[in-house]
């Protein structure tokens, strides 16, 4: 994730009592040695378990392949946790968790009194003169290729394939989301119909487009029987090539339109989900016109435009 976030759910009548606690967490955390030791031990144990999972190995190798040794792609080893020191956390905390780096997004029944409470807690007496942490990364497209992690004892193979792509700031991003949905973005997608329903190679396969602050990427992920891994790769490539060379039937495109518009409506069911939608565009430097453009694109994009993408 590009941001660290703390979410608080509370009744209006308790706002005055709980906001100072939240402010204390953001301003006065001390990272006790005992708690840090427990955290390190738990993370090392979790990592040890995950390193036995094919999908975890594929996911972290994929991230490292496209993002390199940036925080987006660095592989963490057990030894890295051993080197984690309390003073490192405190120094980073002081530089990163400060007023100019903080954004408050409030959702719910907020009226004049609630805003006054919010401002009284976070609007003053929060000073930090430490130099700010500003992380910004650039990436270069990795050369195409295949990476194989050998696990002879495994009865399943994890597949993760993709590449650097566009982010939410690009004008083609909504159209790319439609294309992704067709390929592997929902249960009725082409990848599911072929790899799961027709061939029976997997219980599930999907694709996604992910927008980060400094980059975007596209990926396809699944787990298949080890003996059909190569066959699955052939079928995945076939489905991608069909989208490049053939126009999508109107009936299939209409089904995807309805699914995406319904999902959009379902994701706006309450004030908290509205806040999440706002956060997506706010941290991308966009405004609410993004969602209007998204809906228009889903409704009007043509098969030819998708083929061109």
Segment roles from a protein language model:
Residues 1-131, 167, 197-309:
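Charge-rich, well-structured scaffold segments of protease-associated domains
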Residues 101, 130-189:
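His/Glu-based metal-binding/catalytic segments typifying zinc-dependent metallopeptidases
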Residues 192-193:
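Phosphate-proximal small/polar/acidic motifs at interfaces that engage nucleotide phosphates
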């Amino acid at each position: 994730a590009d941001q660290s976030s703390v979410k608080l759910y509370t009744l209006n009548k308790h706002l005055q009592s709980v906001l100072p606690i939240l402010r204390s967490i953001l301003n006065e955390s001390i990272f006790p040695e005992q708690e840090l030791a427990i955290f390190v031990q738990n993370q090392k144990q979790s990592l040890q378990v995950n390193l036995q999972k094919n999908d975890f190995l594929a996911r972290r190798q994929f991230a490292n392949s496209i993002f390199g040794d940036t925080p987006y792609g660095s592989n963490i080893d057990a030894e890295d946790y051993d080197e984690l020191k309390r003073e490192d956390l405190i120094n980073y905390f002081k530089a990163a968790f400060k007023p100019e780096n903080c954004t408050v997004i409030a959702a719910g029944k907020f009226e004049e009194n609630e805003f006054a409470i919010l401002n009284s807690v976070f609007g003053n007496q929060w000073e930090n003169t430490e130099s700010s942490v500003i992380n910004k990364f650039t990436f270069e497209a990795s050369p195409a290729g295949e990476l194989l992690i050998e696990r002879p004892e495994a009865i399943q193979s994890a597949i993760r394939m993709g590449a650097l792509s566009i982010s939410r700031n690009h004008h083609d991003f909504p159209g790319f989301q439609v294309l992704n949905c067709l390929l592997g973005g929902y249960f009725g997608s082409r990848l599911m119909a072929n790899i799961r329903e027709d061939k029976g190679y997997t219980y599930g396969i999907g694709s996604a487009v992910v927008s980060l602050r400094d980059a975007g990427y596209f990926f396809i992920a699944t787990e298949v029987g080890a003996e059909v891994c190569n066959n699955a790769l052939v079928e995945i490539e076939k489905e991608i090539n069909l989208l490049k060379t053939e126009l999508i039937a109107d009936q299939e495109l209409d089904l995807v339109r309805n699914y995406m518009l319904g999902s959009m409506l379902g994701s706006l069911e309450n004030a908290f989900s509205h806040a999440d939608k706002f956060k997506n565009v706010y941290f991308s430097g966009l405004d609410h016109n993004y969602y209007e453009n998204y809906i228009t694109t889903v409704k009007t994009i043509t098969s030819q435009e998708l083929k061109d993408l």
